[in-house]
Structures are given as C-alpha cells and as structure tokens.
Curated annotation (Swiss-Prot):
Its EC number is 1.4.3.2. This is L-amino-acid oxidase. The lineage of its organism: Eukaryota, Metazoa, Chordata, Craniata, Vertebrata. It catalyses: an L-alpha-amino acid + O2 + H2O = a 2-oxocarboxylate + H2O2 + NH4(+); L-leucine + O2 + H2O = 4-methyl-2-oxopentanoate + H2O2 + NH4(+); L-phenylalanine + O2 + H2O = 3-phenylpyruvate + H2O2 + NH4(+); L-methionine + O2 + H2O = 4-methylsulfanyl-2-oxobutanoate + H2O2 + NH4(+). Homodimer; non-covalently linked. GO terms for molecular function: FMN binding; L-amino-acid oxidase activity; L-phenylalaine oxidase activity; protein homodimerization activity; toxin activity.
C-alpha cells in the first residue's frame, strides 16, 4: 500500500472491504 506506512499496508490488505 504505502511505503511510509508499513502498518497501513498490512491493514489495507487484510481489511480492505471493511473500510
């Protein structure tokens, strides 16, 4: 997702449809 946000990258891949 975003290189500056490593956490967001994993979060986006797991709960993409929720948000």
């Amino acid at each position: 997702a975003d290189s500056r946000n490593p956490l967001e990258e994993e979060f986006r891949e797991t709960n993409y449809e929720e948000f």
